[in-house]
Design a protein with these regions (language model features):
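Active-site helical microenvironments for divalent-metal-assisted chemistry
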Residues: 1-317, 322-366
């Protein structure tokens, strides 16, 4: 079974210290032993779940105690391994993280509960922000395997995720997690609507992709002429986001899906505004659609320039412009702090970085997240 851990150890070896690597390996061995003989609904050995949760956290760049806690997070709840034993073997930091996740697992969410109240309870109960990040990774992997549970249970868990966990991911700035949780939940709460939008997307994709590629080529050519190093890509449309816009705006699918979106990533803030100037020189901006979230970041530290222009063939094009660092934070949110911290061992991360200051604010005001 140790080969299960290989994708994790190969990623963290050389980044974690030998003692940190040993901590993660010991946590895996204990979890593997504690869950011996247990199976998931899919028929896979239970240990595959905590390992998958830890893999998600490795992608975020979380620290060694968090990975250890992720590997052990179901032991106290689902095996004979007690919290006291865990504390003696792994210390207070890992034990407190596991205890925090266990308490969240025991929180019940009924049909009469106010989602906002439950979200505040979840945040207030987590004395360490890392508990919330582990719980989100736990919910994400479970959501990826809902096809193995009965439809009623999957639908119930999907609604709970839309009400509590996806908004929580958004408030923590973890947009990559939020979008995947929303799409997976949508698939099981509204299967017919999900399939219909999925079908429409598949039908319209060729023509939309053609226009997207044309816009990307034009922007790349302009930026090369300006000697601006950049990465220009089309932006994926998420099915749940399309559905929500259809509901809220009362618009037809074609009105929403046909709107082409691209993202431009550059090295520094000065280049962001240079890119904006180059794009507005090529295409006319739509009045009232420019947002400067670089000068005025969102509460979760999201930063980007947003503009909508009238592109080729008179089609509206939504464009996001930001630095690679801003994109990292936009994707991973609060989890980006630990990735920054790990990277900073070699690059000299400082305690007054925006990530660290934001983390301090969240720790002080958890109940208001």
């Amino acid at each position: 079974m140790e080969s299960l851990l290989a994708p994790i150890t190969s990623r963290i070896r050389g980044i974690y210290s030998p003692s940190e690597l040993a901590l993660v390996e010991r946590a895996f061995e204990r979890a593997d032993s504690a869950h011996a003989g247990q199976l998931r609904k899919s028929g896979d050995p239970y240990i595959t779940h905590p390992v998958a949760v830890a893999e998600i956290l490795v992608e975020f760049g979380l620290d060694a105690p968090t990975l250890a806690a992720a590997l052990l997070h179901d032991c106290v709840e689902d095996t004979n391994y007690s919290l006291d034993e865990l504390r003696r073997e792994f210390g207070d930091e890992v034990a407190n993280l596991v205890d925090g996740v266990t308490k969240l697992d025991r929180l019940t969410y009924g049909p009469t509960a106010e989602a906002e109240t439950v979200r505040k309870m979840v945040v207030a109960m987590a004395k360490d922000i890392r508990v919330l990040v582990i719980k989100l990774a736990d919910r994400l992997h479970n959501a990826r395997t809902w096809q193995f549970v009965n439809p009623e249970s999957a639908s119930r868990k999907g609604q709970e995720t839309l009400d509590i966990y996806a908004p929580l991911a958004h408030r923590l700035g973890m947009n990559a997690v939020k979008w995947e949780l929303e799409d997976l939940s949508f698939k099981y709460t509204e299967p017919k609507k999900y399939e219909e939008i999925e079908r429409l997307v598949a039908e319209r994709s060729p023509s939309r992709d053609k226009l997207t590629n044309e816009v990307v080529r034009d922007v790349q050519a302009d930026l090369e002429n300006e000697n601006i190093e950049s990465s220009v890509t089309g932006r994926q449309k998420h099915l749940y986001s399309i559905y929500q816009k259809m509901l809220v705006r009362g618009r037809a699918f074609d009105d929403i899906y046909d709107l082409v979106g691209i993202r431009v990533l550059v090295e520094d803030v000065r280049d962001c505004y240079a890119v904006l100037g180059a794009i507005h020189a090529r295409w006319s901006p739509v009045p009232g659609r420019f947002k400067d979230y670089i000068a005025m970041p969102k509460m979760n530290l999201y930063q980007s320039l947003h503009t909508t222009v009238i592109g080729p063939n008179g089609k509206a094009v939504e464009i996001q412009i930001r630095t690679h660092e801003m994109h990292r934070r936009a994707e991973y949110g609060i989890a980006a702090h630990w990735k920054y911290k790990l990277d900073g061992r070699k690059s000299g991360a400082t305690s007054d970085s925006p990530d660290v200051l934001w983390l301090k604010q969240l720790q002080i005001g958890r109940a208001h997240v």
